[in-house]
């Protein structure tokens, strides 16, 4: 029995109690929101990860870290170093490998990860078909489904399943005046398969069987947005919205079968449209968790897309997004290095917390208040220990040597906090004030 079925039957499980303790909300609210599909536990029940990762309504915003080889760069040691970064900064991890021995790479990443691991199974079967049959779109429906099952058996906790795109939507998008017709790699693979085989989406045709597989492992279906906007000028056009409407129907059927499901979102969205993008998705899908790639509010930010997208991510988090998929400085330019993965993950950790301060209020702001208290006291040791990256903070604090006064090297003897503390002492010792 899956966690949704348990919740619907009124059962309070150890996992629900753990979520309640982790997030600081009553266990009955956890159970109720799981029963409604508004909280998901990202896991593969047969191969639990070392970290408990719930996402959903009134929970802290989580961060996903993408890693993986490419056809141009296959360096497993580098990818395993990225896993270590993800373990430190992230909540979930996706293996998006497209080069090398994909089965071996996936299994090594799962073994090294403390986090629930996700994949995009169509990548593997498309690449295998391309190598064996001289065409990526030559795979059969059974081969695709067998790949999904193989990933589940390996312990994958969530998968991007591009089931929302229809053949009609794909053809019309490719013929349209969109700036970029399709930017989703997996979405383009499914679109190519439908056109090559003159057939409907293989996930949609076999949807009941897909649900059965995920139900067996109580893993999470992440409904991919194949037609997400890859340019801000394409945001919220008929193709993005058309796919979202199809996705909403699939969400309903998944929840009816007791299958955990979340929805993926854009992408590239102007700043003023981000909040209502979240509200629209939540309205159409009944409030299931939303997993968003930023979004990027501009298209000109590379090689600083981790910064540009963190701006959008903070707004989306504040508006109700549950899981943020990070971007790195290499986005739109190439495969990221280990350092770039870390830079992206830290930017998104900051964005997630900024959103939580709005979304969760005082509960999230307690951390900030504590840091500010120590900052006001010039208690550098305690303040630095509470910061998001204490090691880096200490390096900056001492980069010109240990300050000669209690203040830092920016203000030195003219530090307002130092002067304020001195004035407080004078006020306290004076009988005339």
From Swiss-Prot:
It comes from the Archaea. It holds the Pfam family ThiC_Rad_SAM. Keywords: 4Fe-4S, Iron, Iron-sulfur, Lyase, Metal-binding, S-adenosyl-L-methionine, Thiamine biosynthesis, Zinc. GO terms for molecular function: 4 iron, 4 sulfur cluster binding; carbon-carbon lyase activity; zinc ion binding. Signal peptide: none annotated. InterPro entries: ThiC, ThiC/Bza_core_dom, ThiC/BzaA/B. Its EC number is 4.1.99.17. PANTHER family: PHOSPHOMETHYLPYRIMIDINE SYNTHASE, CHLOROPLASTIC, THIAMINE BIOSYNTHESIS PROTEIN THIC. It comes from Saccharolobus islandicus (strain M.14.25 / Kamchatka #1) (Sulfolobus islandicus). This is Phosphomethylpyrimidine synthase. Pathway: Cofactor biosynthesis; thiamine diphosphate biosynthesis. Belongs to the ThiC family. GO terms for biological process: thiamine biosynthetic process; thiamine diphosphate biosynthetic process. Catalyzes the synthesis of the hydroxymethylpyrimidine phosphate (HMP-P) moiety of thiamine from aminoimidazole ribotide (AIR) in a radical S-adenosyl-L-methionine (SAM)-dependent reaction. Zn(2+) binds at residues 268, 332. Binds 1 [4Fe-4S] cluster per subunit. The cluster is coordinated with 3 cysteines and an exchangeable S-adenosyl-L-methionine. Substrate binds at residues 66, 94, 123, 162, 184-186, 225-228, 264, 291. Its cofactor is [4Fe-4S] cluster. [4Fe-4S] cluster binds at residues 408, 411, 415. It catalyses: 5-amino-1-(5-phospho-beta-D-ribosyl)imidazole + S-adenosyl-L-methionine = 4-amino-2-methyl-5-(phosphooxymethyl)pyrimidine + CO + 5'-deoxyadenosine + formate + L-methionine + 3 H(+).
């Amino acid at each position: 029995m899956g966690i949704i079925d348990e919740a619907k039957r009124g059962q309070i499980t150890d996992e629900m109690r753990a979520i309640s303790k982790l997030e600081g909300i009553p266990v009955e609210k956890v159970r109720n929101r799981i029963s409604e599909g508004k909280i998901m536990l990202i896991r593969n029940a047969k191969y639990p990860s070392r970290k408990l990762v719930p996402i959903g309504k009134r929970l802290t915003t989580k961060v996903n870290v993408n890693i993986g080889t490419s056809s141009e760069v296959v360096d497993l040691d580098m990818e395993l170093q990225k896993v270590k970064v993800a373990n430190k900064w992230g909540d979930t991890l996706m293996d998006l490998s497209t080069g090398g021995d994909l089965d071996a790479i996936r299994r090594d990443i799962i073994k090294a990860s403390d986090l629930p691991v996700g994949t995009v199974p169509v990548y593997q079967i498309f690449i295998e078909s391309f190598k064996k049959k001289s065409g990526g779109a030559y795979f059969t429906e059974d081969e695709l489904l067998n790949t999904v099952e193989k990933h589940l058996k390996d312990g994958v906790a969530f998968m991007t399943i591009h089931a929302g795109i229809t053949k009609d939507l794909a053809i019309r998008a490719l013929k349209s005046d969109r700036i970029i017709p399709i930017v989703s790699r997996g979405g383009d693979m499914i679109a190519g398969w439908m056109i090559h085989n003159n057939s409907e989406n293989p996930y949609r045709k076999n949807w009941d069987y897909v649900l059965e597989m995920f139900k067996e492992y109580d893993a999470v279906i992440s409904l991919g947005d194949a037609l997400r906007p890859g340019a801000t000028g394409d945001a919220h056009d008929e193709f993005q919205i058309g796919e979202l409407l199809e996705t909403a129907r699939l969400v309903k059927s998944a929840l009816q079968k007791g299958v955990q499901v979340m929805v993926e979102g854009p992408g590239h969205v102007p700043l003023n449209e981000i909040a209502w993008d979240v509200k629209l998705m939540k309205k159409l899908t009944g409030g299931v968790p939303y997993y968003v790639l930023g979004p990027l509010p501009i298209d000109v930010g590379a090689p600083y897309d981790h910064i540009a997208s963190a701006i959008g991510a903070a707004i989306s988090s504040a508006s109700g997004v549950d899981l943020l998929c990070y971007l790195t400085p290499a986005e739109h330019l190439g495969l990221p290095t280990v350092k770039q993965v870390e830079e992206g993950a830290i930017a998104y950790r900051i964005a997630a917390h900024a959103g939580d301060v709005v979304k969760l209020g005082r509960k999230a702001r307690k951390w900030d208040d504590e840091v500010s208290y120590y900052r006001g006291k010039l208690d550098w040791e305690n303040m630095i220990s509470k910061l998001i990256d204490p090691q880096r903070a200490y390096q900056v604090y001492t980069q010109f040597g240990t300050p000669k006064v209690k203040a830092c090297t920016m203000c030195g003897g003219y530090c307002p906090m130092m002067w304020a503390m001195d004035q407080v002492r004078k006020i306290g010792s004076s009988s005339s004030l």
